[in-house]
Amino acid sequence: LAWRLRDKTSRLAHWFTVTGTNGKTTTVQLLTAMLNQGGIKAEACGNIGKPILDAIRDPEGFDALVVELSSFQLHYLGQIFPFSSAVLNLADDHLDWHGGFEQYKAAKAKVYENTVAACVYNVMDKSTESMVEDADVIDGARAIGFTLGIPGRSQVGYVEDILCDRAFLDDRANNAIEIATLEDLSEIGVLTPHLMAN
């Protein structure tokens, strides 16, 4: 419903959708903070923050909505076209409701459908990569991996004490750029491995 109403608002926001078994709320909060810090008016919504219908109907509007989606919400999701989508990880959860792991995985995989720009997956969780490979995305959307190890091409990861980007630069085959140091991450309280991955 929210997706269908979005074009009737004063400001058409990009949707950044996030799911996974663990880490969704933290990731949505971090992404919302980064977008706002970068001058993009963003709001966390879905399972956290403002209800998504309220965010869409906000009279001032937003440039971006960072939407946390559960497997239950994704199960019933109609067609949307997120700007970017992410599956952080996948573990046995809610299997009684979904009827098994494959059904749970299929519900989570719906987050990638029709993604416009970037499908973010966890390099250390091969099931998330296979979900991206199987997704029907918009032509030009890229698969972007994240890892706590050394990043490969089209990935973000760590080399020694530096968070490196090999995904969003022209010569990603041969180069990387520094995003932050571990000291920077420590200063904002995200130095534990699961928070570093988020």
List where the protein language model places each region.
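Adenine nucleotide phosphate-binding catalytic loops in nucleotide-utilizing enzymes
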Residues: 101-102, 140-198
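Phosphate-binding loop of NTP-binding sites
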Residues: 2-142, 157-162, 167
